């Protein structure tokens, strides 16, 4: 459950380390984003010589949330941190690698490139 001002880790090698959500996309006055949703983020911490720099405003896909994700079979999945993957305007990831597990709910939201780059799909 990601809202405005939420800090997230970046789960790719785009050069960003931490980002802050500044807008949840999809509908007017939408307050919360969950796994697979697209948000607008500001880069708060980045490494030198990365593809992005501090202060950049980008779009990102939420890939992990500390809030439970309920599945149709009744099971629940949750992660230790909130994490996102930076994307471009064509919804393709900026980085070439994804770090950490991602849930299979991303498949239903058509983020197949992120699924294919991820080391583990839960």
Curated annotation (Swiss-Prot):
PROSITE patterns, A to Z: RIBOSOMAL_L14
SUPFAM superfamilies according to UniProt: Ribosomal protein L14
GO biological process annotation, one example: translation
Keyword terms of this UniProt record: Ribonucleoprotein, Ribosomal protein, RNA-binding, rRNA-binding
Gene3D superfamilies linked to this entry: Ribosomal protein L14 (2.40.150.20)
Pfam family, one: Ribosomal_L14
GO terms, molecular function: large ribosomal subunit rRNA binding; structural constituent of ribosome
Coiled-coil residue windows: none
Keyword rRNA-binding found: yes
Function noted in UniProt: Binds to 23S rRNA. Forms part of two intersubunit bridges in the 70S ribosome.
Protein name as it appears in the record: Large ribosomal subunit protein uL14
Source organism: Agrobacterium fabrum (strain C58 / ATCC 33970) (Agrobacterium tumefaciens (strain C58))
